[in-house]
A protein has these predicted regions:
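Rossmann-like NAD(P)(H) cofactor-binding subdomain of soluble oxidoreductases
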Residues: 58-66, 70-148, 166
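NAD(P)-dependent Rossmann-like dehydrogenase/reductase catalytic/cofactor-binding core
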Residues: 193, 200, 225-268
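Conserved active-site and cofactor/substrate-binding residues in soluble primary-metabolism enzymes
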Residues: 7, 11, 15, 83, ...
Length: 268
């Protein structure tokens, strides 16, 4: 049994508690960005409105605070939106002891100081060398994970053994993990696929969408190589895997469909 904190009580953060509980870990869920939402979870007996089901009785829901972060955790999972990553960083930078962090958040940010695009793990790592940050990406819809439908993701860390150790903590019969040392490739693939899923969704029909899917992979390879990732990572779970699930059933694909029909971005 390990003591694991999940930061972010949205759909993915909440869904991620299921494999953790099934591995008999002591799991705490906290919401730093939307405290009203966390209160509603408690009032409704842990019923999650997005997942449409109750969280396990074994999941403890606590108020987000510096004191909570200062407790001894075997793993901290960051599952906030990309907007909330800076807020979490401000708290994590004060942690004095070595701690393993697993980032579920997908996205990129422009670093105004260094004038370059950085990943969520790079943003989170600023100012604290005690954080050992791994990232988890791949084709995993929160509702399917919560309903224990077989899902596969990839954990990336420059030290592949650290990624494998985290995988042992979270893997179940329905939730499988692969491993990669290409952190850049995994994070950039997972982030830019959102753009391409919109492009694919804008296609007039299946023929067009299929062609756009193929062309999207070509461009993703080029971009991943440009950002110093490995282009073969594009053909893994964080690339083609995540692109597929987003293009078939994701919100970005639906957005692309409306844009393709002529709606403005605001209306779509």
């Amino acid at each position: 049994m390990r003591k694991i904190l999940v930061i972010g009580a949205g759909a993915m953060g909440a869904a991620f508690t299921f494999p953790l509980v099934d591995n008999n870990h002591k799991v705490t869920l906290t919401e730093p960005y939307n405290k009203d939402f966390q209160n509603k979870l408690l009032k409704k007996n842990k019923f999650h409105p997005t997942l449409k089901l109750k969280l396990s009785k074994r999941v403890s829901i606590k108020k987000f605070s510096s004191e909570l972060l200062d407790e001894k955790w075997d793993l901290i999972v960051v599952a906030v939106s990309s907007i909330g990553i800076e807020m979490v960083r401000q708290y994590l930078k004060n942690i004095k002891k070595k701690i393993s962090i697993l980032v579920l958040t997908k996205g990129l940010k422009y670093d105004q100081i260094n004038k370059k695009i950085i990943t969520m793990s790079e943003q989170l790592n600023k100012g604290n060398q005690n954080l050992n940050v791994s990232v988890l990406k791949g084709p995993c819809l929160a509702k399917e994970l919560a309903n224990k439908i077989k899902s596969y993701t990839v954990i990336a860390n420059q030290n592949i053994n650290i990624a494998k150790n985290i995988g042992k903590l979270i893997s179940t019969k329905y939730y499988k993990t692969e491993y990669s040392s290409d952190v850049k490739g995994v994070e950039f693939s997972s982030a830019i696929k959102n753009i391409y899923s919109m492009i694919i969704g804008s296609g007039e029909g299946e023929n067009t969408a299929s062609a756009l899917f193929r062309k999207s992979l070509d461009e993703m390879e080029y971009l991943i190589k440009y950002f110093r990732g490995k282009k073969e990572t594009v053909h893994g779970l964080a690339g083609v895997g995540d692109l597929y699930v987003s293009a078939v059933g994701g919100r970005n694909s639906k957005m692309g469909e409306y844009l393709g029909k002529g709606y403005t971005f605001k209306i779509a």
